[in-house]
């Protein structure tokens, strides 16, 4: 059986074709707003799907300060909560520490994004 290779040409074309849909979707429009948005959302999603706790402080430690400031990270988190994509809860190990997770809507939106993204890649 021959191994299929990624068709860069067709994949790039599909990325461009998908722009309109991504901008129309509230979640992906927010996800792609900036590199910092992408980083924060991916870190919260990783914590959610891999079942570990991640706090604002953890996120700040993982993201280079050249990508975004603590204030910008905090603002993205606040917007994520307001949009219903994130929830903030007390840590299981320390009630003073607040941790972030994707809400049910956030999990659904993120999963739908990944499924659509997977279809973008063309192998021949």
Regions of interest found by a model, annotated:
Residues 91-114:
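Short, cationic-aromatic polyanion-contact patches
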């Amino acid at each position: 059986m021959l191994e299929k290779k990624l068709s860069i040409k067709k994949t790039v074309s599909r990325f461009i074709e998908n722009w309109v849909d991504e901008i129309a979707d509230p979640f992906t429009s927010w996800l792609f707003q900036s590199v910092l948005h992408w980083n924060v959302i991916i870190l919260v999603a990783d914590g959610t799907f891999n079942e570990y706790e991640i706090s604002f402080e953890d996120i700040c430690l993982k993201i280079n300060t050249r990508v975004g400031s603590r204030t910008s990270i905090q603002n993205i988190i606040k917007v994520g909560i307001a949009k219903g994509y994130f929830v903030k809860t007390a840590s299981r190990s320390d009630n003073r520490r607040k941790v972030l997770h994707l809400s049910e809507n956030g999990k659904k939106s993120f999963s739908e994004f990944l499924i659509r993204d997977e279809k973008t890649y063309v192998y021949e």
